[in-house]
């Protein structure tokens, strides 16, 4: 069996990736989220596949087909609830994974980081087109509002929006193509995950100290397989609790009403995992400016490696930078809260201040903190 594992071409790849992979001996539970994201992706693809067997992507029957899945299909309610709440778990793990990368300086593996950012954007696109499929009120109006943002692009904006819609409004053509996108994108994500891992295994994992771990490596199996299994059990416990006891807690009540182009919901808001970006979009009272800020809030992750000023990689021994990091986390939680509030005072000004602080922390304060800490650590000879 050992010979087969180490010599058979296909098994050899799996062996080098998940079994005999040399891993740092000191990586903490923050390194569990990569494998949890992999499991989330598998759960989403499997539940999505079973949902797609019963779903119809037609404006007249889409809403009814989702109701049919929940009422008439064996365990359809469970599959649907797992898929909807699985998306929330996916994003929770994704944000923690990115946060870990920023805290411990993992972004200095530039290829791995850049592919990770592309992965995050692809997952966000998949979640957006997926939210449109049940064809409830928030699905329809969410699709209308967000696709309409593209009309802010000078000269080609309106043409581009109508091209994406497949007509003059969000309608049957839009729903059909969104279903096609929602079906194909997870497989593109799967391919990108393999590339992400390929680049990660070129360098090996980072570790909490941020120093070279090559002198002290242990095999991935059994040490980290068992550690990942514990994380997986805890994640499944949370997911199953959500899906079984309060499946609609993170959803929007408006989506229980079939889509009606003649009736706008009082507050159009996306799922919780988009609220921080939505708050940044709304904080600028100009359409094009808002769209650019929205894009910048996500694409800023790509320039984080260029903004690294410290001689140390990790924030483990850098208390001032740690304060900046936790300010950023608190700021993102504030933005998430603001994104779910109506557009009125004091929420407008809080959103604008939080948006300004978001960019300031990443572009100005964190690099300055790194430089200042380096200055403090320079030996002072009398």
Swiss-Prot record:
One of its GO terms (biological process) is mitochondrial electron transport, ubiquinol to cytochrome c. A ubiquinone binds at residue 201. Binds 2 heme b groups non-covalently. Heme b b562 binds at residues 83, 182. One of its GO terms (molecular function) is ubiquinol-cytochrome-c reductase activity. Its cofactor is heme b. It is a multi-pass membrane protein. It is found in: Mitochondrion inner membrane. Heme 1 (or BL or b562) is low-potential and absorbs at about 562 nm, and heme 2 (or BH or b566) is high-potential and absorbs at about 566 nm. Belongs to the cytochrome b family. This is Cytochrome b. It comes from Monodelphis domestica.
């Amino acid at each position: 069996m050992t010979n087969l594992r180490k010599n058979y071409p296909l098994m050899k790849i799996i062996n080098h990736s998940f079994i005999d992979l040399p891993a740092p001996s000191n990586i903490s539970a923050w390194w569990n989220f990569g494998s949890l994201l992999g499991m989330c992706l598998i759960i989403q693809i499997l539940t999505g596949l079973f949902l797609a067997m019963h779903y119809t992507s037609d404006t007249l029957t889409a809403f009814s087909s989702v109701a049919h899945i929940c009422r008439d299909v064996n365990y359809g309610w469970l599959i649907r609830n797992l898929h909807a709440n699985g998306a929330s778990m996916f994003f929770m793990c994704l944000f923690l994974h990115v946060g870990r990368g920023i805290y411990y300086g993992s972004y200095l593996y530039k290829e791995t980081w850049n592919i990770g950012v592309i992965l995050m954007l692809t997952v966000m696109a998949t979640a957006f087109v997926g939210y449109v499929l049940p064809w409830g009120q928030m699905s329809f109006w969410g699709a209308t509002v967000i696709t309409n943002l593209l009309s802010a692009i000078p000269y080609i904006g309106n043409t581009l929006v109508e091209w994406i819609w497949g007509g003059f409004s969000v309608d049957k053509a839009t729903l059909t193509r969104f279903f096609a996108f929602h079906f194909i994108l997870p497989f593109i994500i799967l391919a990108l995950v393999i590339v992400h891992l390929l680049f990660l295994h070129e360098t090996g994992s980072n570790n909490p100290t941020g120093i070279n771990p090559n002198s002290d490596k242990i095999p991935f199996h059994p040490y980290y397989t068992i550690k990942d299994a514990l994380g997986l059990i805890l994640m499944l416990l949370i997911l199953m609790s959500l899906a079984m006891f309060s499946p609609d807690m993170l959803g929007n009540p408006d989506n229980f009403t079939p889509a009606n182009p003649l009736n706008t919901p009082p507050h159009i808001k996306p799922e919780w995992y988009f609220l921080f970006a939505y708050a940044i979009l709304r904080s600028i009272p100009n359409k094009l400016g808002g769209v650019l800020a929205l894009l910048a809030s996500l694409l800023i992750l790509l320039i984080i490696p260029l903004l690294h000023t410290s001689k140390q990689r990790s924030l483990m021994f850098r208390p001032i930078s740690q304060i900046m990091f936790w300010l950023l986390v608190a700021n993102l939680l504030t933005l998430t809260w603001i994104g779910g509030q109506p557009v009125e005072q004091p929420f407008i000004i809080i959103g604008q201040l939080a948006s300004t602080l978001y960019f300031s922390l990443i572009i100005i304060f964190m690099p300055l903190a790194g430089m200042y800490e380096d200055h403090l650590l320079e030996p002072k000879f009398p």
